[in-house]
C-alpha cells in the first residue's frame, strides 16, 4: 500500500466521497426505472438493479479489477491476473492511471472502491430496456459473466495507461464508452435474445409512479457529481470543472428536451424533464473533464435534441426497449464521445487534447470514432454470446405466462398492497391475487338460485376499493372476485406515452368482476356496475351450482 506520508488526505477524502455518490446511483437507478414500469413488475425491477451491488462487487474484487487495472498482459487488451482477489496491492495506482496527472496520492483501495461502483452500475442500465422480461437467476449469472468478460477489458482499453485505445489516443473521462456505449451495446444484444413483450408495440405500459421516477432521477443527478467529479482522483480545479460541466449539460439537456416535446406534442412533461437531464448527463460523461463550461452547455443542448429524436430508434430496429435506454444512454454515450473530438480543450486539462473547434484538427475526432466502433462491436458480440448461452442453459427470458406479474411469480409479493376488495389495489387497479376482506366477511351460507354476474370494468373508472365492495355487498353479493383481463379494442386508440412519442394501442387492460348473487338481487348488482361504466348489455349472467362459501 502507499506509504501514509505520501497519501494526500484531501484527494483521498474526495475520491472516497465520490465512491459513495456513485454507489448511491444504483438504488437511484432502481427507483428511476421502478417508477416507470407496470405496477406488477416494480419489485422485479428493483431487485434486478440492486442485485448488481452484490454480484458485481464480488466479481470486481475477485477477478474484474486485475483484468481492468492489473499490469498489462502485453497486448493492451487486458491486465494480468496477479491481483486476483486483491492479493498484491503493495503499490498505489500507477502515475497517470485512469485520467489523473502526476503522482497518484490516494491509497490503492480507494481507487479499487471508486472503480468498483462504476462496474456495478454499468450492467444495471440494461434492465430498463428489458423491463418485464428477465428471469432473475439468468440475469444474476449474466451480470457476473458480463462484468468480467466485457466491462473489465473495455475499462482496461481506455483507463489503463497501457490500454490499446489509451495508447491510440482515444479519451473517455468518466465512461461515455466504458459505461454508456458498452451498456447500450449490451442492450441491443440482450433484446435480440429475450425478445419483445406481449402486445408490443400496440399495448401501452404507462408508468406506475411518476413521482418515484422523479425521485430516482434526482438521486442520479446528485450521484453524477461523484461519477464525473472524481475521475481525476484529485480534489482540484479539474474536478470542479467536471462537476460544473456535469450540471450545466444536464440543465441544457432538460430544457431542449422540453422544447422538443412541446413542438412535437403540444405539451411538455415532467418525465420529459428528467429524461432530458439524464440524456445530458450521459452525453457529458466522456467529456466532463476535458471541455469548458460553454462547451458543456452546447453538448447538453445537442444531447437534448438528438436523444429525443432517437426515441424512434427502437421502432426502426423493432426492438422492445421498454424505458428507452438506447435513446438516452447508448446514443448519449456515443454522441458525447464524438463531441469531445469537436470541443476538447487542452487548456482545461493538460491531459486533454484540442478538438476540431479548438485548433486540434480532426485527429481527436478520429480517435474517438475508432474507440466508439471498437467498444460497441466488442460489447455487442460478447454480450450476445453471453445472453444466448445463459438463455440456453438456465433461461434469461421469463416465461410468457408470468411476465405480466413478475413480482408475484418471482418474489411472492407486491409493491403496493393497499386493497380492501380481493384482487384490487387501493387505487382500483387490478391485481392477480384474490382473497377475502376479513372486515366484511360473513358466515358461509347457502345461496339459493345463485347467479354469476360477469363484467369487465375500466380500472380508471373504479371507485375506492371499499366503496365498490360496500356497494356490491349492499346489493346482495355473496362473493366478489376481481382479476386481470385484456380485451381487444374495437378500433386502435392512440395515447401519448411519457417520453413524448405516440403509440397505437390495440389491447386494453381491464378488471374482470365476477359476483355470485341470489337471482332476485341480480338487477341491483347490475345497477351498481352500471354506475361505473358497465352497460347491462355488456354484463353476462348465468346460473351456477349451489354456492356455499364466500371467497
What is the role of each PLM region?
Residues 2-445:
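Glycine- and aromatic-enriched membrane alpha-helices
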